[in-house]
Amino acid sequence: MTTKDHSLATESPTLQQLGEFAVIDRLVRGRRQPATVLLGPGDDAALVSAGDGRTVVSTDMLVQDSHFRLDWSTPQDVGRKAIAQNAADIEAMGARATAFVVGFGAPAETPAAQASALVDGMWEEAGRIGAGIVGGDLVSCRQWVVSVTAIGDLDGRAPVLRSGAKAGSVLAVVGELGRSAAGYALWCNGIEDFAELRRRHLVPQPPYGHGAAAAAVGAQAMIDVSDGLLADLRHIAEASGVRIDLSAAALAADRDALTAAATALGTDPWPWVLSGGEDHALVACFVGPVPAGWRTIGRVLDGPARVLVDGEEWTGYAGWQSFGEPDNQGSLG
C-alpha cells in the first residue's frame, strides 16, 4: 500500500458511515457522460443509444485475492483493469464500448475514498474509448467484488464471431503477449525490477479501436487473449471446426521481450507468451492483408479442431480456467 493509499484508508469516512446513497452520490456527481448516454445515473435505469439498433453486451467479474490483490494494486488500478477487460470483449466482437454498468461489493468498513478511487480508475479507462459509467449497485460483503457489464455499438458493421474462421486464412495479433503473466510471476517472487512488466499485470493495455478496424476489413473470427493465447485460440478452432498452426518464429519478439525477466526468475518465457492470460491483445483470422498494427503469427488449416505450434502439440500449461486444476508450465522443444 502506498503512502497515498494509506491516507485514503485512515482519513476517509467508511462506506457504512456515509451510507449507500451518499456514497453513490459521491461516485457519480460531476461526471460528464458521452453523447451516446441519453440518461445516466439517478433514475431506475440508464438510457443508452444504439446506433444501428443492435447492442453488444458482455459481463465480467473481479474478486479480491483471485483476480487482484490490494497489496499490489491501488483501487484506481483495479477500476482500470475492470473496465479494460470488459472493453476488450466488446472489441473482440468488432464493436466499440459505449457504456458500462458497475456492481461493487466491499466490507462496510472500507474507506469511501477507496471506492471513489476505484471509480476514478473506471472513468479514466472508460474515457480512453469515449465511454461512460451509466449506473450500478453497491453492496456490503466480506471482500471486494467488482462486476462490470459493458455495452457496445457495432456502428453498422457485422459482428465478428469465433465461428467464422476458414482454412486458408492467416492468423494475426495486435497487442503484446505474455506481459501480464511475466508481471504476475515477478510480483509473486518479490522481484522489484521490470517495473513495466509488473505494471502490465495490474493494468492491461487492450489495443482499443483495432477490433472495429479488423471488422471493417472483413475479419473472419476474432477473440481477445484473456485466458492465454492457446486457450483462446482453441475456442476459435472448436467454434469454426478448423486447425490453427502458430509460428514460433513469428512470436519470437514477444519471447525476446521477456527473456531478461525469465532469466531473473530462472524460467522459460515461452509459457508466458503461449499460455499467459490477461494481456487482452486481439487475435483474428483474415483472408487478405492484415490491417495496420497487426502482425501475422500463424495460419488456419482444415480441421480437426486443434491448436498447434510449428505443427506440433504444445504439451504444457495451455491457459486459465476458473474451475480448472493447476498444470505444469511446459516448454517449446
UniProtKB/Swiss-Prot annotation:
Mg(2+) 1 binds at residues 59-60, 137. Keywords: ATP-binding, Kinase, Magnesium, Metal-binding, Nucleotide-binding, Thiamine biosynthesis, Transferase. The keyword Nucleotide-binding applies. GO terms for molecular function: ATP binding; magnesium ion binding; thiamine-phosphate kinase activity. One of its GO terms (biological process) is thiamine diphosphate biosynthetic process. Pathway: Cofactor biosynthesis; thiamine diphosphate biosynthesis; thiamine diphosphate from thiamine phosphate: step 1/1. ATP binds at residues 136-137, 162, 226. It catalyses: thiamine phosphate + ATP = thiamine diphosphate + ADP. It comes from the Bacteria. Transmembrane segments: none annotated. Gene3D superfamilies: PurM-like C-terminal domain, PurM-like, N-terminal domain. Mg(2+) 3 binds at residues 44, 89, 224. SUPFAM superfamilies: PurM C-terminal domain-like, PurM N-terminal domain-like. Substrate binds at residues 67, 278, 320. Its EC number is 2.7.4.16. Mg(2+) 5 binds at residue 227. It is an enzyme of class 2 (transferase). Mg(2+) 2 binds at residues 60, 89. The keyword Kinase applies. NCBIfam families: PRK05731.1-4, thiL. PANTHER family: THIAMINE-MONOPHOSPHATE KINASE. HAMAP family: TMP_kinase (MF_02128). Catalyzes the ATP-dependent phosphorylation of thiamine-monophosphate (TMP) to form thiamine-pyrophosphate (TPP), the active form of vitamin B1. Was identified as a high-confidence drug target. Reaction mechanism of ThiL seems to utilize a direct, inline transfer of the gamma-phosphate of ATP to TMP rather than a phosphorylated enzyme intermediate. Belongs to the thiamine-monophosphate kinase family. This is Thiamine-monophosphate kinase. It comes from Mycobacterium tuberculosis (strain ATCC 25618 / H37Rv).
